[in-house]
Curated annotation (Swiss-Prot):
This is Nucleotide-binding protein Bcep1808_2900. One of its GO terms (molecular function) is ATP binding. Keywords: ATP-binding, GTP-binding, Nucleotide-binding. GTP binds at D57, A58, R59, S60. ATP binds at G8, I9, S10, G11, S12, G13, K14, S15. InterPro entries: P-loop_NTPase, RapZ-like, RapZ-like_N, RapZ_C. The keyword GTP-binding applies. Displays ATPase and GTPase activities.
Length: 302
């Protein structure tokens, strides 16, 4: 059976992700007490159901300590995937304000006896981060701070489509001017490379457009940067595998996240496609989420 566990911070999109999995044919349960999960999996398997999705959050705080061991045990018999959704505190506060929803931990006792009850939304968010932090290392993290609901649904579907027999590597392009991604395991700064933004014809385009690809592909320094990052990844990916890592997010950042980082993320993904399961996300580029074109896969080094 394939089991998808959705966890993370309240307000980061767990309900959206669970709905996407339900549309994909998964049997979905929200806020299931973790200790019930093995029994539910056995029951559904006997009933002929082979796909289960469960959302787990801080409302199950009494059982969260059991989750690491439970995930390991379930993985012995099932294809278990963990999706950890995160977002910046500012984004979460804005979402709770707009929806007028109450945070699950608002009004709950603080772990600090001198504080009493958690009175502010920010306190509740930070307390939840502490509670669910141990689960982050088991899952593929997605920073939803800037994601629209339809984009998140698409990424969840891509996540479950990936083969689970090897390390999954996500290449994520981003712009430093919009902040660094919360879900990055490795981060590379490519702002030292020539910027297509200063060419007025290239400015409105992205690193997925052929004129920008041609501009960057003609520069030896760009290929030197790509070669160095590729060599680093090829050296260290075996060590991530030995550490039993299932997911690795490699963030590539330029100033605006539109040209250089997009091109390099796509090029690196094409190079590593034979060595790992790869997916590409362009956080800040104005591109269709389904337009992760493989134009750069056909680029040949000079």
């Amino acid at each position: 059976m394939r089991i998808v566990l959705i966890t993370g911070i309240s307000g980061s999109g767990k309900s959206v992700a669970l709905n996407a999995l339900e549309d994909a044919g998964y049997y979905c349960v929200d806020n299931l007490p973790p200790h019930v999960l093995p029994e539910l999996a056995r029951y559904l398997a006997e009933e002929g159901q082979h796909r289960l999705a469960v959302a787990i959050d801080a409302r199950s705080s009494a059982s969260l300590d059991e989750m690491p061991g439970l995930i390991r045990a379930l993985s012995l018999e099932h294809d278990v995937r963990v999706l950890f959704l995160n977002a910046s505190t500012q984004s979460l506060i804005q979402r709770f304000s707009e929806t007028r929803r109450r945070h699950p931990l608002s009004g709950s006792p603080s772990h600090d006896a001198n504080v009493g009850l958690l009175s502010s939304l920010e306190e509740a968010i930070e307390r939840e981060r502490e509670l669910v932090a141990p689960l982050a290392e088991f899952g593929h993290q997605i920073d939803t701070s800037t994601l629209r609901a339809n984009v998140l649904r698409t990424w969840v579907k891509r996540f479950i489509e990936q083969k689970n027999n090897d390390l999954m590597v996500m290449f994520e392009s981003f712009g430093f001017k919009r902040g660094v991604p919360l879900d990055a395991d490795l981060m590379f700064d490519v702002r030292a490379l020539p910027n297509p933004y200063y060419d007025h014809e290239l400015r409105p385009l992205t690193g997925l457009d052929q004129p920008v690809i041609a501009f960057l592909d003609a520069l030896p320094i760009v290929h030197q940067m790509i070669d160095d990052i590729h060599a680093f990844l090829m050296k260290w990916l075996p060590h991530f595998r030995e550490d039993n890592r299932s997911y690795l997010t490699v963030a590539i950042g330029c100033t605006g996240g539109q040209h250089r980082s997009v091109f390099i993320a796509e090029t690196l993904a094409a190079r590593l496609a034979h060595d790992a399961n790869v997916i590409v996300r362009h956080r800040d580029a104005p591109v269709d989420v389904d337009a992760s074109s493989r134009l750069v896969a056909d680029v040949h080094r000079p």
